[in-house]
């Protein structure tokens, strides 16, 4: 009653008294009330301690486990967060694959922190563990490869990128391979030919080969691959590459300009987009900087302007809160989830 009437102080005393009781259910309700208050007031360290106590009393309660994990993430308590994930998998709160993914993301974050603190061996070890836990986790593969290259283990770094390409070709993997390629444009083209061979028919393989061929001024090879992916509805990225090809091969300014016009109206290039709030970032992050949700960035195209307008019209008509994110001059609104 005190909480409902807005008397938080009185409610806090009541919850505290309940938490002092020996009867488990009463004590849990008191801890839960105190936890809710601490979170509402932004006292994360206090909330974390209360969540630990609540989880000890009710280790099989999904909401308690998830709250504890969220608080451990927000406070950067990565070691305990991983232990919470292991317990959640054992108690069947989450599946084994989901547990591995969470642990991989935690290992990625630990690798970043270790590198920033100058603990290079630890950074390398955490990155390796992230890749082992989630072999299709592209950011972990690129991080591990870069760290291996820094350690002078270029051949192993190349293998990491190639193994990841088999599972999930991605432009950031191609960029990592470019960084690993010693020499000039011809060497990069040879490296991309080898990489693309592991997933020959994938769109990203054709695009990676086209980019490398353009750099090496192998115009016919570039056109061959771009013709395959251009089709009737090329993405903005492919249209820009076609513009570069027309200018480079034929010095055809008009054709190049026409492709640039198509690029402006084509399907937007994919980006890392938070599935929770729509925040867009250039580099993947374990925790969204806007909504603070864990592992919510997906690689997908942002919505077209027309889609945004339709959603905004729906908001006006029905009062739905979509939580737009403004990044620079562009407003991003989440599209339906299309993949991880």
Explain the meaning of each model-derived region.
Residues 1-286, 290, 297-340:
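Repeat-based scaffolding regions
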